[in-house]
């Protein structure tokens, strides 16, 4: 959807869940369609992409100015005296939390509020992230 904020236009695009349907041990089928979503963007205005899981970031083209994601809950289990124990991501701690910049592409991964897969959250305070957009 093309939005206009005081004369500054930008696209807000969203993806379906990448892990929507469980098909067996360690295998999910998603309902995300990155190519189809980006195909609907018809101008050169900046794009903000909303994605539940941050793992899609490796496929996001430079055309997208910012990707916003969650799902990892900041690593979910983080102890100060040990390396990160578990993160619900194919990439481990790489996309667990924060502002990530890779090859000029930007993604913010929120720690969120709950937990994922394992009903436990330690060392990662819940959060709601507010993003202020500017020129």
Predicted features along the sequence, with ranges:
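Soluble catalytic domains of enzymes that build or remodel membrane lipids, polysaccharides, and related
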Residues: 1-135
């Amino acid at each position: 959807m093309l939005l206009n904020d005081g004369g500054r236009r930008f696209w807000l695009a969203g993806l379906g869940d990448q892990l929507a349907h469980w098909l067996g041990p360690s295998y999910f089928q998603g309902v995300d369609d990155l190519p189809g979503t980006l195909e609907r963007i018809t101008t050169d205005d900046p794009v903000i992409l909303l994605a539940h899981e941050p793992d899609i970031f490796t496929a996001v083209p430079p055309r997208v100015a910012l990707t916003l994601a969650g799902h990892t809950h900041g690593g979910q289990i983080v102890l100060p005296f040990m390396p990160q124990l578990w993160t619900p991501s194919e990439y481990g701690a790489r996309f667990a939390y924060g502002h990530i910049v890779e090859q000029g592409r930007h993604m913010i991964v929120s720690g969120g509020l709950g937990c994922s897969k394992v009903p436990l959250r330690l060392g990662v305070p819940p959060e709601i992230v507010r993003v202020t957009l500017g020129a």
